[in-house]
Structures are given as structure tokens and as C-alpha cells.
Amino acid sequence: MGNVFSGWHLLVILLVIVLLFGTSRLPKLSKSVVEALKIFRRSFNEASDITRSQDGHPDSQGNFAESASSVPFVKSEKQSEKRASVTEAKKSK
């Protein structure tokens, strides 16, 4: 496929971004983009660690994750209340 963007393409894209957002907003925009990339990278690494631990490999700190069967299931009060109200509604029909 070759090189899709040449230097001129990137220059035009940069010029359009400056015209759309203005020079006063660019620092805020770039900070937001960098922060979003950091969050994405952190989430991706956490997901990779979970996948590795499920395959029997330790995460980045050398710890193995607990299997889903060893983690107890705890119902919240809201779930119990909601289930009770749904059951009552069905009985009243």
C-alpha cells in the first residue's frame, strides 16, 4: 500500500487542526489526548495482565490472579430489593 501520508499531508492536517481549534485551545486539547492515551494504555496493560493470569502466567508484579471460582459472589441490597419488587409485581398481575 505504501506510505499513505507524506509530509505535505501532515502539514495540511496540522493547519486544519489549528484553524478549527485555535492556538489557545491546542494545549488543552493535546493534554486531553495525552491523558486519554495514558488511560487507554493503563487499561490495556491491566487487561493483558488479567488474560495472562487466567492462562497461568503471573501479572507484571509477579502475582497470580484469583480464579473466578475462588472469589465469593456477594449480592448487593439493591439487587435483592429489585428482585423482590419484580417478583411482587409478577404476583399482583
UniProtKB/Swiss-Prot annotation:
One of its GO terms (biological process) is protein transport by the Tat complex. GO terms for molecular function: protein transmembrane transporter activity. The chain crosses the membrane at residues 1-21. Keywords: Cell membrane, Membrane, Protein transport, Translocation, Transmembrane, Transmembrane helix, Transport. The keyword Transport applies. It is found in: Cell membrane. Residues 75-93 have a biased composition (Basic and acidic residues). The keyword Cell membrane applies. It is a single-pass membrane protein. GO terms for cellular component: TAT protein transport complex. Residues 49-93 are annotated as: Disordered. Gene3D superfamilies: 1.20.5.3310. Residues 60-70 have a biased composition (Polar residues). Belongs to the TatA/E family. PANTHER family: SEC-INDEPENDENT PROTEIN TRANSLOCASE PROTEIN TATA (PTHR42982:SF1). Part of the twin-arginine translocation (Tat) system that transports large folded proteins containing a characteristic twin-arginine motif in their signal peptide across membranes. TatA could form the protein-conducting channel of the Tat system. The Tat system comprises two distinct complexes: a TatABC complex, containing multiple copies of TatA, TatB and TatC subunits, and a separate TatA complex, containing only TatA subunits. Substrates initially bind to the TatABC complex, which probably triggers association of the separate TatA complex to form the active translocon. This is Sec-independent protein translocase protein TatA. It comes from Tropheryma whipplei (strain TW08/27) (Whipple's bacillus). The lineage of its organism: Bacteria, Bacillati, Actinomycetota, Actinomycetes, Micrococcales.
